[in-house]
Amino acid sequence: MKKEIENREDLYLLVSKFYVKLLKDDNIKHFFDDMVKENTLEDHLQILVDFWDNILFYTGAYRRNAMRPHLLLNQTKPLQKEHFKIWLNHFNNTLDENFTGQLVHAAKTRAQSIAMVMELKVNQL
């Protein structure tokens, strides 16, 4: 049964199910190979929970530069327009499959903006 996004536990559910999709997608999973090999995926998921906690609940939990790791990744594994579309599609589908309510719309809107900005930034290099 779908529920509203209410807390960090819900955000963990969101990002963990989202990453299951990403890691199964042959078009995008190679971006996460190092995290899987180095066994740092769980750490990454916790960072994402902080990020979305800050975005949706304004907690101040995320204090990092979200662009920096993506710019570094782009140097070795170039991020293309299609990758951002795939990322966004999986994110939106994960939201729709598991949650309902106003924060679903807010998360989708912010994810769209984030994808657009990241795509612009990586293509500037």
Residue ranges and their predicted role:
Residues 1-125:
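Core of compact, soluble alpha-helical bundle domains
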